[in-house]
Curated annotation (Swiss-Prot):
Family (UniProt): Belongs to the class-II aminoacyl-tRNA synthetase family. Phe-tRNA synthetase alpha subunit type 1 subfamily.
Naturally occurring in which organism (per UniProt): Alteromonas mediterranea (strain DSM 17117 / CIP 110805 / LMG 28347 / Deep ecotype)
Keyword Transmembrane helix: no
One Gene Ontology biological process: phenylalanyl-tRNA aminoacylation
Pfam families per UniProt: Phe_tRNA-synt_N (PF02912), tRNA-synt_2d (PF01409)
InterPro entries: aa-tRNA-synth_II, aa-tRNA-synth_II/BPL/LPL, Phe-tRNA-synth_IIc_asu, Phe-tRNA_ligase_II_N, Phe_tRNA_ligase_alpha1_bac, Phenylalanyl-tRNA_Synthase, tRNA-bd_arm
The protein, known as: Phenylalanine--tRNA ligase alpha subunit
Molecular-function GO terms, alphabetical: ATP binding; magnesium ion binding; phenylalanine-tRNA ligase activity; tRNA binding
EC id: 6.1.1.20
């Protein structure tokens, strides 16, 4: 077959190729080990010395022509494939965007943030402390005697006789009073642990305690601040009562109730004036300084604010429940 005919045949097959695989078959047919041009090169040995150089040059020129045609068609096919892919993946910018559903704060986190915001505006700073506490900071310094029920094994998680998971964040107040001098205004949010589990109790829950120590601090100050806090937190006018109670670390002590929508009183927090023995335990003179303290269960406040009946729902990570608080 003459070279012109081979070139024409190759060009025809190259033009007809619709994909890279077919184009490669054309390359093999004409320039592979057993290709038509390769066979012609092998036949050069049969020619005379005078004919061989000119014939070899013509075969190589034909090979270059076919190779250039294959390269050009290959580039065309790659461009065509890319354009096709881009067209398939094209985004219609005139369509409205697909919005992602945003996450949201856990209801307990929301409550803690609301509490911190309110008391922060009154000059209270946020303090934290260890969740593994010793007996002095968890009990002794708080005027809780050795025979108090709170110190029993069935209420407290002990590591050894003097180390335990804290049962309240009051230890943070003790550590703050040891480290800083009055005047003091602090709140201490955090996790606390008690050996209890039912519809209204879990072994771990969140608590916020507050402390104010200064000269001439009175129960009237405590009552006014808590009254304003509850109205601010629930965002409605509430009937509030302070009911006499007993806590080892405060004297006098009170529990604060709000009137529920069902016409019944609901306990929301405990409070009182810091007991002189607590001030003495941290080296503060109770003759010079007085103070008040209060404590509230975060989950309980959250339940009341959002109408949740089972405290355990806060810890089950059910998205159907949590999405209600967006």
């Amino acid at each position: 077959m003459e070279l012109d005919a081979i070139i024409n045949q190759a060009q025809s097959q190259i033009d007809a190729a619709q994909d890279a695989a077919t184009l490669d078959q054309v390359r093999v047919e004409f320039m592979g080990k057993k290709g038509k041009l390769t066979d012609l090169l092998k036949g050069l040995g049969k020619l005379s010395n005078e004919e061989r150089p000119a014939a070899g040059q013509k075969i190589n020129q034909a090979k270059q022509v076919i190779q250039q045609a294959i390269s050009a068609k290959g580039e065309f096919l790659r461009t065509e494939e890319l354009n096709k892919k881009l067209a398939e993946e094209a985004v219609d910018v005139t369509l409205p965007g697909r919005t992602e559903k945003p996450g949201n704060l856990h209801p307990v986190s929301r409550t803690i943030a609301r509490i911190e915001s309110f008391f922060g505006e009154l000059g209270f700073s946020v303090k934290t402390g260890p969740e593994i506490e010793d007996g002095f900071h968890n009990f002794d310094a708080l005027n809780i005697p050795a025979n108090h029920p709170a110190r029993a094994d069935h209420d407290t998680f002990y590591f050894n006789p003097d180390m335990m998971l804290r049962t309240q964040t009051s230890g943070v107040q003790i550590r703050t009073m040891e480290a800083e001098k009055p005047p003091l205004r602090i709140i201490s949010p955090g996790r606390v642990y008690r050996n209890d589990y039912d519809q209204t109790h879990t072994p771990m829950f969140h608590q916020v305690e507050g402390l104010m120590v200064d000269k001439n601090v009175s129960f009237t100050d405590l009552k006014g601040i808590l009254h304003d806090f509850l109205h601010h937190f629930f965002e409605e006018s509430l009937e509030i009562r302070f009911r006499p109670s007993y806590f080892p670390f405060t004297e006098p002590s009170a529990e604060v109730d709000v009137m529920g929508k069902n016409g019944q009183w609901l306990e929301v927090l405990g409070c009182g004036m810091v007991h002189p023995n607590v001030l003495k335990a941290v080296g503060i003179d109770p003759e010079e300084y007085t103070g008040f303290a209060f404590g509230m269960g975060v989950e309980r406040l959250t339940m009341l604010r959002y109408g949740v009946n089972d405290l355990r729902a806060f810890f089950e990570n059910d998205l159907r429940f949590l999405k209600q608080f967006n």
